[in-house]
């Protein structure tokens, strides 16, 4: 699955909340995780940070991982062979992960947990409650 080639990765974080193209790409990618016959699933992008990092963030957040785990997972890319070949630097990476974290944390209701806000986002982009439960079941069992 190619999430999208027309999307500029550096603005991925801001646009997943506003642009239908991004929402549709995420929905299609996430639907793959609803069917246990699709496992194991390997997903990647050019550096493993932008599209891959966004998808991994959503999946891990949906499964209840805490903020520290989400940040560590995302920042691992920085230490890969190609992790900083784009010259983004640690400050840019922190900005990107902060955009994801706070974008989801405050998505629907700031009193809701991160996981609840991610679930609300997934429902808003067209996944069903059954889809969400299937993803969790497939990843947690």
Question: Can you annotate each of these PLM segments?
Answer:
Residues 1-42, 54-141:
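Cys-dependent protein tyrosine phosphatase-like superfamily
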Residues 47, 51-52:
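Ser/Thr-glycine-rich phosphate-binding loops at phosphate-binding pockets of nucleotides
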């Amino acid at each position: 699955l190619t999430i999208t080639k027309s999307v500029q990765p550096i603005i991925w974080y801001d646009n997943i909340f506003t642009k239908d193209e991004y929402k549709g790409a995420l929905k299609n990618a996430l639907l793959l995780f609803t069917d246990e016959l699709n496992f194991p699933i390997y997903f990647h992008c050019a550096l493993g940070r932008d599209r891959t990092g966004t998808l991994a963030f959503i999946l891990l957040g949906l499964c209840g991982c805490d903020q520290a785990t989400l940040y560590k997972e995302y920042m691992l890319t920085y230490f890969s062979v190609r992790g900083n070949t784009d010259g983004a630097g640690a400050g840019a990476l922190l900005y990107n992960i902060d955009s994801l974290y706070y974008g989801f944390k405050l998505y629907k209701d700031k009193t809701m947990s991160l996981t609840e806000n991610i679930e609300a986002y997934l429902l808003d982009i067209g996944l069903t409650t059954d889809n969400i439960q299937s993803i969790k079941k497939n990843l947690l069992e």
